[in-house]
């Protein structure tokens, strides 16, 4: 139905006859001659319909609507110099139509304009409800093409490195230590349930036990969790696992993979090796394990300076075992008013969202003198002022914001304020790609609600041998404070991927499961197949998974992963196009041995 794609025509096709098929992007009537922008996936080309050269074609062109599916036969010619369009890849040529055939025409009004010439901002709800139309738009075509290019680049790289692609089950069993599972009732095994995988974690480890050595998969994963702009109930991971490599070898391989993707997809040459930072350093300097290193305003600890101050907010926090930290905002003296920092202000609100009661502050005036208000002013001696200036390195014109309280809350609040002010004050450089490996995570964190330890990543991460030692009798004592051989790749403050070396010893895996509160019987019920496999000669192995949706979002310069997925869900986990999820008939539920207890809420 076509000899060429619309976007492929160039000057070397001049004087040739072509057959094109696509959509009418725009139609313009210029005093008897009609111009049509014909669009397909490859791009757009101008069609010229002259009644003197094709009366039948002109009669068809007079009645065309935008988004009509049209076939065009015609001759390629050079555009006149004055009408060439350098913004269009096909802008040097046009097709003089000899025959037009309508393949299909819209029979109803379109909910929004699709044309690449129309900059209309369409509500996301409308775009998702009519996603098949939205996919015709240049933005979505470009994003999905970029996604394809990213996946193909990764596949070629991994295959060159000796990896093989293996699919793992989508119907599996529910396991603890993760988000909520999506459950699928079994018709054959009444009263029993499958779970959709949150990741291929256990299966890829079993592939290593099976001797495959290097595995990868573009894996579909499912998590029933509260959604944000960068989360979906179903998402895609570039997942891999490898045997007989240590942590540095895994990091080296994966940063070469990332370097290849950024070079071929974005034309950006990354400087390798990528920087490393320990989890402890990241928390101290940035208050988060996903630090954005494109700008300054790092957190600075000042607990030792303010511990003996009369200002109770500071001294009380230190006495209670907490911390006092601060960030220095360059130029903040003039740009951030007191009103914004006090209750009701936007900066105060950001700190409050992170659990902080508020922020203290001092200003460094243009002459270098320190100015502040309230109780902190009455208790800030000249000696303390000098110590704070030296510790923070604050220049004249700066604003110093303080957080005080338990360390976790202080870190979270100052991290949030730091990110907020960096955007507000336009401190984030454009087109910066700041990659960072964060390493040496703790193996466990304390869950105060359940009064137990839980795995920070997952309970299959290997411990740092320096912390664990060689004596199994000491594992139970040393594991709670051990570092994991885990690593996350962070880009511009977002987690791009994460992984670890895995436990390949059954006794140690059992001990870790006990550490997170699983009794022996429960561990066997949940993970017996893995523990059995580890007893049969499991090799040292490790892996990583990259969030493909988020990676493409960053490569495409989008704000939401929904703009990098063909058919995404909303933040309420609904598909507006198909109205999924939907109900099930009584017969279907009966076959599945399931009864619904859902009661529609009463309308007020």
From Swiss-Prot:
GO terms for cellular component: cytoplasm
NCBIfam families: aspS_bact, PRK00476.1
Keyword Cytoplasm carried by entry: yes
Binding, L-aspartate: 177, 223, 457, 502
InterPro entries referenced in this protein's UniProt entry, alphabetically: Aa-tRNA-synt_II (IPR004364), aa-tRNA-synth_II (IPR006195), aa-tRNA-synth_II/BPL/LPL (IPR045864), Asp-tRNA-ligase_1 (IPR004524), Asp-tRNA-ligase_1_N (IPR047089), Asp/Asn-tRNA-synth_IIb (IPR002312), AspRS_core (IPR047090), GAD-like_sf (IPR004115)
Residues annotated for ATP binding in this entry: 223-225, 232, 495, 547-550
Species assigned in the record: Synechococcus sp. (strain RCC307)
Name recorded for this polypeptide: Aspartate--tRNA(Asp/Asn) ligase
GO biological process: aspartyl-tRNA aminoacylation
Important for tRNA non-discrimination (site feature) positions: 30
EC number of this enzyme: 6.1.1.23
């Amino acid at each position: 139905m076509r000899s060429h794609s619309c976007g492929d025509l160039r000057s070397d096709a001049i004087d040739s006859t072509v057959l094109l098929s696509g959509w009418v992007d725009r139609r313009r009537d210029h005093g008897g001659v009609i111009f049509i922008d014909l669009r397909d996936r490859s791009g757009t080309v101008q069609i010229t319909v002259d009644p003197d050269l094709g009366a039948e074609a002109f009669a068809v062109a007079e009645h065309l609507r935008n988004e009509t599916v049209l076939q065009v036969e015609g001759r390629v010619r050079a555009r006149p110099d004055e009408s060439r369009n350098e913004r269009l890849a096909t802008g040097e040529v046009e097709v003089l139509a000899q025959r037009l055939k309508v393949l299909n025409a819209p029979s109803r009004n379109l909910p929004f304009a699709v044309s690449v010439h129309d900059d209309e901002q369409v509500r996301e709800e409308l775009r998702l409800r009519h996603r098949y139309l939205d996919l015709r738009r240049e933005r979505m075509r470009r994003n999905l093409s970029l996604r394809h290019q990213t996946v193909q680049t990764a596949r070629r790289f991994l295959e060159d490195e000796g990896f093989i692609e293996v699919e793992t089950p989508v119907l599996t069993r529910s396991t603890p230590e993760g988000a909520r599972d999506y459950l699928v009732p079994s018709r054959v095994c009444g009263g029993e349930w499958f779970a959709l995988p949150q990741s291929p974690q256990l299966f890829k480890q079993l592939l290593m036990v099976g001797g495959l050595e290097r595995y990868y998969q573009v894996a579909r994963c499912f998590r029933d969790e509260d959604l944000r702009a960068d989360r979906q109930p179903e998402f895609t991971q570039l997942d891999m696992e490898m045997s007989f490599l240590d942590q540095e070898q895994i990091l080296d391989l994966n940063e070469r993979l990332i370097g290849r993707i950024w070079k071929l997809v974005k034309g950006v040459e990354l400087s390798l090796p990528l920087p490393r930072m320990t989890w402890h350093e990241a928390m101290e300097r940035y208050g988060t394990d996903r630090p954005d290193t494109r700008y300054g305003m790092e957190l600075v600890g000042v607990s030792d300076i303010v511990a003996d101050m009369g200002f109770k907010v500071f001294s009380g926090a230190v006495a209670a075992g907490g911390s006092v930290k601060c960030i220095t905002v360059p130029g903040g003296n003039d740009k951030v008013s007191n009103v914004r920092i006090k209750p009701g202000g936007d900066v105060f609100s950001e700190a409050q969202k992170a659990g902080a009661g508020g922020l203290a502050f001092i200003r460094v005036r243009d002459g270098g003198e320190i100015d502040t208000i309230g109780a902190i002013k009455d208790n800030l001696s000249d000696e303390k002022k000098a110590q704070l200036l030296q510790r923070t390195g604050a220049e004249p014109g700066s604003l110093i914001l303080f957080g005080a309280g338990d360390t976790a809350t202080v870190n979270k609040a100052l991290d949030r304020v730091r990110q907020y002010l960096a955007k507000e004050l336009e401190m984030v450089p454009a087109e910066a790609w700041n990659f960072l490996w964060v390493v040496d995570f703790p193996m466990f964190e304390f869950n105060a609600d359940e009064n137990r330890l839980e795995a920070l990543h997952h309970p299959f991460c290997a411990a740092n041998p320096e912390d664990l030692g060689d004596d199994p009798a000491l594992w139970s004592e040393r594991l709670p404070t051990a570092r994991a051989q885990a690593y996350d790749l962070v880009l511009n403050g977002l987690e791009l991927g994460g992984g670890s070396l895995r436990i390949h010893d059954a006794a140690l895996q059992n001990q870790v499961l006990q550490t997170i509160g699983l009794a022996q019987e429960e561990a066997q019920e949940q993970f017996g197949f893995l523990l059995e496999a580890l007893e049969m000669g499991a090799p040292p192995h490790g892996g990583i998974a990259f969030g493909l949706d988020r990676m493409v979002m960053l490569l495409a310069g989008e704000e939401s992963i929904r703009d990098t997925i063909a058919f995404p869900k909303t933040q309420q986990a609904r598909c507006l196009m198909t109205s999924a999820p939907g109900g099930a008939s009584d017969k279907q539920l009966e076959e599945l041995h399931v009864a619904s207890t859902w009661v529609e809420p009463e309308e007020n």
